[in-house]
From Swiss-Prot:
GO terms for biological process: translation. The gene is rpsB. This is Small ribosomal subunit protein uS2. Transmembrane segments: none annotated. CDD domains: RPS2.
Length: 245
């Protein structure tokens, strides 16, 4: 099982927190000290917590469960979309719509609308409309795809959330908490860890750090799914041998 190590985190700047004046006392036990008025996160505490979260995600993936990746701020969006797509997981990279979990019935209707518009765009329906109507539908399609494109294949509520910047995604965390959906979150020194089941104390702004979190989580999903596939193949191969004996 491949896990994150101290060198990976140091190289990515995971240990750099926020300015000391913005700190949240609830994160005090994860802070090593301060340098130039910047809090330094204790990576000796982050390391086992990060790896525990990865193990949890890998086990979820083994059970064919869905992990929803959430990162809507500018520095995270692109990385979230790319890594989620790499491991075939749903994601929200643009803006969290209120009720995305707690009012999923309405969201499902919007996803159906998105799919209908995608079909119309491909089958020539748009070309048969007036320019004004075609433009309106194209804009509607673009808007829905930006908001819901990452979850259109989710099929139902996710089994866990992985969140970059828990302050920025507090609405998503609150909705997950209401529904009993486990939350894994990167929590910086200025944030509150409340509502997060698997806390990863770390820098939630640096692109290299976000790449490490997302890449590691995507790898964990892939490992979990490959473990299931590998286990099935191994069983099929061993069955004839057992029969021969």
């Amino acid at each position: 099982m491949s896990q994150v190590n101290m060198r990976d985190m140091l190289k990515a700047g995971v240990h750099f927190g926020h300015q000391t004046r913005y700190w949240n006392p609830k994160m005090g036990k994860y802070i090593f000290g301060a340098r130039n008025k910047i809090h330094i996160i204790n990576l000796e505490k982050t390391l086992p917590m990060f790896n525990e979260a990865l193990t949890f995600v890998e086990r979820l993936a083994q059970g064919k469960n869905k992990i929803l990746f959430v990162g809507t701020k500018r520095s995270a969006g692109k990385i979230v979309a790319e890594e989620a797509a790499r491991c075939g997981s749903p994601y929200v990279d643009h803006r969290w719509l209120g009720g995305m979990l707690t009012n999923f019935k309405t969201i499902r209707a919007s996803i159906k609308r998105l799919r209908d518009l995608e079909v119309q765009a491909e089958d020539g329906t748009f070309a048969k409309l007036t320019k004004k109507e075609a433009l309106m539908r194209s804009r509607d399609l673009e808007k829905l795809d930006r908001s819901l494109g990452g979850i259109k294949d989710m099929g139902g509520l996710p089994d866990a959330l992985f969140v970059i910047d828990v302050d920025h995604e507090r609405i998503a965390i609150t909705e997950a908490n209401k529904l009993g959906i486990p939350v894994i979150g990167v929590v910086d020194t200025n944030s509150s860890p409340e509502g997060v089941d698997y806390i990863i104390p770390g820098n939630d702004d640096a692109i290299r750090a976000i790449q490490l979190y997302m890449g590691s989580m995507a790898d964990a999903v892939i490992r979990g799914r490959n473990h299931v596939a590998g286990g099935t193949e191994q069983f099929v191969e061993e069955a004839p041998v057992a029969a021969a004996e």
